[in-house]
Amino acid sequence: MLRAERGGILNVRSLASLLPIPDFAVYAASKSYLTIFSEALRLEVRERGISVLALCPGPVHTGFGEAAGRHGEPPETPSREWFYVPKEEVVRDALIALQGDRARLHPGWRAASLAAAISLLPMAAIRCMMRHRPRRVES
């Protein structure tokens, strides 16, 4: 890409990157790292014609939860189903954002709204919510 002076890099984050989530500390921290890494890399390669996008899609039906061994309430539960972003929408929006030289993207209005709301909350409120959230059930 550097020789060709064109191309794009897509780093997949998570809404978990915005929250200190019990039982997901390493996952959330690694996704948070991607945010700053992507921003710094973008500054390094932008003048060489390379785009860098930090994609934060929120929940998408991909089979990741099952592969990761998550237990507890299934993702098809009606209370959560409305929040999922169709994978086709994520891919379409990511490609458009990458071509448009966007730095970050939360595809779908639900994920974008939640990310905006989280950014406005004080950390004390976020900690309180995380302490009282349902914990995953071990089998």
Where are the regions a protein language model picked out?
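Active-site loop immediately N-terminal to the catalytic Tyr-X3-Lys motif
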Residues: 21-25
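SDR active-site lid
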Residues: 43-110
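A transmembrane-helix-recognition feature enriched in membrane-embedded lipid enzymes
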Residues: 101-136
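Catalytic tyrosine of NAD(P)H-dependent dehydrogenase/reductases that use a Tyr as the general acid/base
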Residues: 27, 35
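Active-site helix of classical SDR
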Residues: 30
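A short helix-coil junction within the Rossmann-fold of NAD(P)-dependent oxidoreductases
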Residues: 1-5
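Residue(s) in the substrate-gating loop at a strand-loop-helix junction
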Residues: 14
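Conserved catalytic-site region of short-chain dehydrogenase/reductase
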Residues: 17-19
